[in-house]
Curated annotation (Swiss-Prot):
Subcellular location, record wording: Nucleus
Domain of life: Eukaryota
Region (Disordered) location: 1-146
Gene3D superfamilies: 3.30.70.330
NCBIfam families named in the record: SF-CC1
Species of the source: Mus musculus (Mouse)
Keyword flag Transcription regulation: yes
Protein name per its UniProtKB record: RNA-binding protein 39
Length: 530
């Protein structure tokens, strides 16, 4: 068996060598394949490793670059912030931008960047500051008119409603011409209207048409329109100054005033005629209201005369004023000049204790009142001194009373001698004698005679013959003040039926109260004999 095994081994040996060779070859191939595979794997690993390293390096580089960029950006931002802060500090005192809030800055930085925001802040800083007022547009002058030309285009309005506004007057007078300006005179303290105003027109031709609107109702109250006398006053004052210079101050008496009239109201009425030095309105110490009269001192006597001529009889608060001259100061008035001081009015006259007791005793005489015994004893101890003080005080009181009576009497006499302010209405006296007139229709004949005469000067829109008047009065209303002035100048002083006619102006409200139908009269009358 062993031989068989050996023979078989010998026979199979060459085949085993081949197999071994094949196996070795196969093994070598497999090893080479494995080596190749391992080499390829290692190469791929190396490639992957190199790629990953490169990626990591690139990432690191990018990170470093991004960090450097961020550092540069942060540095530039800090620099720009510091610059913007310094600029803001410079401009903070002048102007604070309304866009400096965090929302606006974040929006700008996110969208348009910080440099543009800085430019924007510059532009904003150059814009107008909120503390500077906007300049009003330059108004071009309508006309280069002198004060005299403006006065010729101005009318004076009186008896205005309390609630009237400049717009109401502008609308009312726009029917006769274009209105340039309306200036209402108001109280300085209460800001309420004083019932008077000045209306300036563009054209001079509108002034007579505006005067013709006298009597028309504005907000339910009939208005009085007159021409402005400022031009005449200014011309007279200039002529007087050129000839003889200023004549010095002049004092006027103003009486028959309403008790609610104040010094500011009088100043607003009299000041257009000239500069006023002082206004003294006599006040009642008990009620604190006006006594109804006062004194106004003008710096120029001519201005005072013009004010006297124009404002005597001027109706204020429903009552016609009485304006007159005040007599010159005498020695007696100069002796009592200390009574006119404001300091004396505030402090009074100091009589002392004894003087007050003696005055109390003098006032108690004749009244049945008894003064206390202690007061009587004190008076007996120093009777002579007390009597002297009371005598001095009585002299002062009597002197003041006589002066006030003399001043008021002279002022009333002067006021009575001056004609009142011209209006559309006037009264004719001595036109007839009711006791001797017996013919039928005699009043119609007188009416026709007056109408015929007045038609020569502008006509008549209302007439009334008072048949029961002992003075023979005839009341006439003309269409305008100019017509009334012409008629009064023609009729005053003329003789009619053996008597001299006297003509006097009647305030328009008084005339309307007497004859309500005359308020709506506008048609010119003609004689009935035709």
């Amino acid at each position: 068996m062993a031989d068989d095994i050996d023979i078989e081994a010998m026979l199979e040996a060459p085949y085993k060598k081949d197999e071994n060779k094949l196996n070795s070859a196969n093994g070598h191939e497999e090893r080479s394949k494995k080596r190749k595979k391992s080499k390829s794997r290692s190469r791929s690993h190396e490639r992957k490793r190199s790629k990953s390293k490169e990626r990591k390096r690139s990432r690191d580089r990018e990170r470093k670059k991004s960090k450097s960029r961020e550092r540069k950006r942060s540095r530039s931002k800090e620099r720009r912030r510091s610059r913007s802060r310094s600029r803001d500090r410079r401009f903070r005192g002048r102007y604070r931008s309304p866009y400096s809030g965090p929302k606006f800055n974040s929006a700008i930085r996110g969208k348009i960047g910080l440099p543009h925001s800085i430019k924007l802040s510059r532009r904003r800083s150059r814009s107008k500051s909120p503390f500077r007022k906007d300049k009003s547009p330059v108004r071009e002058p309508i006309d280069n008119l002198t004060p005299e030309e403006r006065d010729a285009r101005t009318v004076f309005c009186m008896q205005l409603a309390a609630r009237i506004r400049p717009r109401d007057l502008e609308e009312f007078f726009s029917t006769v011409g274009k209105v340039r300006d309306v200036r209402m005179i108001s109280d300085r303290n209460s800001r309420r209207s004083k019932g008077i105003a000045y209306v300036e027109f563009v054209d001079v031709s509108s002034v007579p048409l505006a005067i013709g609107l006298t009597g028309q109702r504005v907000l339910g109250v009939p208005i009085i329109v007159q021409a402005s006398q400022a031009e005449k006053n200014r011309a007279a004052a200039m002529a007087n100054n050129l000839q003889k210079g200023s004549a010095g101050p002049m004092r006027l008496y103003v009486g028959s005033l309403h008790f609610n009239i104040t010094e500011d109201m009088l100043r607003g009425i009299f000041e257009p005629f000239g500069r006023i030095e002082s206004i003294q309105l006599m006040m009642d110490s008990e009620t604190g209201r006006s006594k109804g009269y006062g004194f106004i001192t003008f710096s120029d006597s001519e201005c005072a005369k013009k004010a006297l001529e124009q404002l005597n009889g001027f109706e204020l608060a429903g009552r016609p004023m009485k304006v007159g001259h005040v007599t010159e100061r005498t020695d007696a008035s100069s002796a009592s000049s200390f009574l006119d001081s404001d300091e004396l009015e505030r402090t009074g006259i100091d009589l002392g204790t004894t003087g007050r007791l003696q005055l109390m005793a003098r006032l108690a005489e004749g009244t049945g009142l008894q003064i206390p015994p202690a007061a009587q004893q004190a008076l007996q101890m120093s009777g002579s001194l007390a009597f002297g003080a009371v005598a001095e005080f009585s002299f002062v009181i009597d002197l003041q009373t006589r002066l006030s009576q003399q001043t008021e009497a002279s002022a009333l006499a002067a006021a009575a001698s001056v004609q009142p302010l011209a209006t559309q209405c006037f009264q004719l006296s001595n036109m007839f004698n009711p006791q001797t007139e017996e013919e039928v229709g005699w009043d119609t004949e007188i009416k026709d005679d007056v109408i015929e005469e007045c038609n020569k000067h502008g006509g008549v829109i209302h007439i009334y013959v008072d048949k029961n008047s002992a003075q023979g009065n005839v009341y006439v209303k003309c269409p305008s003040i100019a017509a009334a002035i012409a008629a009064v100048n023609a009729l005053h002083g003329r003789w009619f039926a053996g008597k001299m006619i006297t003509a006097a102006y009647v305030p328009l409200p008084t005339y309307h109260n007497l004859f309500p139908d005359s308020m709506t009269a506008t048609q010119l009358l003609v004689p009935s004999r035709r």
